[in-house]
Structures are given as C-alpha cells and as structure tokens.
C-alpha cells in the first residue's frame, strides 16, 4: 500500500477505542489483506503541530488499553497501568500517548477472528504476518490521523520488536525509541518454545485447522496449555521457586492426583487468557515473533542496526530467560544512537518490564528527553 500523509480520520476521545481504516495492506510476503482496521486509544491532547505523540506498543497478548479500568471493548484493566497520565512517565499534560492493537490481534484490529469481505471470519485464510507488517499497519493508521512523525516509540517484548522495526524502518517518522526486553532477531530458544506453544494449540481437535470461530467450539485446552508454557518463560526461576518451591496446592496431594502450587498457578494463568484472547491471534502473532529478524533484507543484523540514525534507550532485565541480557547488549553495541545498555534489576524475569514500573518509568523519561533533543536538532 502507499501510505498517505493526508489525514482522513480523527483520534478517539481519551481512553476510548477508535477504529482506523487503512485500506488494503500488502504484506512483506506479497500477500494482501483487504479492509484493514487498526484499533487505537489515546491519552493526552494532540498538539496543534501533531508532534507530541508517544506510541506505546504492546506485547503478544496485550492490546491498546495501556492504562485505566476495564470498560467497553477492553474487559481487563490497563496492562501497563500508570505509564501514561498527568505526572506519569508519559506525562499527558505534555505528551499524547497513542496505543494500537496490533495487526493480527483480537481487540478491534483486523485478525483471524475478524470478518473478511465474504462476511465470514478470516480463520485459516488469514495470512502469516511479520513484525514489519505490524509496524507498516501502525504507520498507516497514524498517517490516516495526520500524524506523520512521532516523538517516540516505546515497547517491550513483541512491543520492543515493533519499536525496533519502527526506528530501523521509519527513521524519518520517529525521533526516539525505547527498546525493552527484546533482541535483534528470534533465537533458537525462542523459536523452540514458541513453536511448541503453537503445536499445543493445533493439537487440540477443536482447532479445526483454524476455522473454529463459527462452530461453537474453540481450542481452549490447547490455548490454556500454550499459555502455561509461555508463562514459565515470562517469569524468573528464582521468583517462582521462592513463591512456590515444591509445595502442594493447599491440601491437595500430587501423589494422589492432586496438584502442586506452581501447577495451580499456571492453570490459573491459562484460564485467565481464555476470557480475553483468541487462539488464532495467538498463533499468528507467535509466528510473527518466530520470524522476527531486523536484518532480513537489510544486509544482516549488524548492517541494519549500524545504519539506524534514531536515538534509542535499550533496556534489559537481569533475570529475563526468554530475552537474556546478551540480546539487549547486542542492540546497545550496534545501534549508533544508544549510549549504553540500561539494566533493570529484577527477580520477575521477562515480565520485569511490566512489573518494575519505577525503573522502567525512568527509562521512558530518558527516551522522551532524547526525543526533545532530536526534535530541536531536526527543526
């Protein structure tokens, strides 16, 4: 698609969900998705120059609702509550925080559960997408709103991969970036754990080759199992052992068919996801993570990163076993606009980027300071 910078739509009211039509989208693979819609929320007021936007990018099972209580269209509270608002790291007395639901998601944006032109869910017909495709859709949605340059992009995990593709692929449209708990490409360990999650979903007979949306049956057992396995990679080993050790769940006896405490905890995590997420989106977005490689078509990782002119803050979590610190160190070493790796001490593993709000809030403030300085240089 050709991205037009002529505004055709407007931002929704603060905290409400708006659906932005971006038309047909040609993917990196060459496939085309027609009638793409991207869900958007915002906090803060857009400046007259439209130059104060901070784009907040969610991880795998997130959505556009970054802060605030549950409400229409967002059945759970904000996943990064407190990150945006008056006096918050993204201070909405100055900045306008904008969050999208990613292409392929299930909270308003076009994905496998959305209706195609024939009035039926996309299901198995929804094509594989890449992180790069997700960012192209976000850029198009913002352009439809008349936002041609953003102050900063901020994200962790899959959101960090999206932020990385923003600064590498669209350096003229972003002044600074915060890359949290992410790497330049998918590792063998990540692909191994993530393809196993996909296999769990597809092994569920109710998967029905991905065309389950109108059958009254969904691969709930497979999605629960995938989430349990994923959640283990999100939390820290020491944290889990400190909380649960080898304890039984209450009065249950594992030797007599009962459960361990950590087993009960993981089952609860799987159950929670079922109430708010679609298995088809889980598969599509996990495949996008598997194919993540900022160096693809750009001469390799080193060449792609060294060519990026955008100032960035790179942050990693000490106990992250899904995206270990060596991956952020590579980004910090190769991105010319990075002044060194920022390390967040945490026992919470990969989820530390969500839990350690004070430390991460300071990294956000540093990123917005870079955006200010870069904005002065570009004027």
Swiss-Prot record:
Q: What class of enzyme is it?
A: transferase
Pathway involvement of the protein, from the record = Amino-acid biosynthesis; L-methionine biosynthesis via de novo pathway; O-acetyl-L-homoserine from L-homoserine: step 1/1
Annotated substrate binding sites: 227, 351
What are the subcellular locations of this protein?
Cytoplasm
- GO BP annotation list: methionine biosynthetic process
| Keyword Amino-acid biosynthesis assigned | yes
Q: Which SUPFAM superfamilies match?
A: alpha/beta-Hydrolases (SSF53474)
Sorted alphabetically, which Pfam families does this protein's record hold?
A: Abhydrolase_1
| Catalysis: reaction(s) | L-homoserine + acetyl-CoA = O-acetyl-L-homoserine + CoA
UniProt keywords, alphabetically? Acyltransferase, Amino-acid biosynthesis, Cytoplasm, Methionine biosynthesis, Transferase
Q: Which residues form the active site?
A: 157 (nucleophile), 320, 350
**Enzyme Commission number(s) from the entry:** 2.3.1.31
| Entries under PANTHER family matching the protein | HOMOSERINE O-ACETYLTRANSFERASE
Summarizing the function annotation, the protein's role is: Transfers an acetyl group from acetyl-CoA to L-homoserine, forming acetyl-L-homoserine.
Q: What protein family is recorded?
A: Belongs to the AB hydrolase superfamily. MetX family.
This protein's name: Homoserine O-acetyltransferase
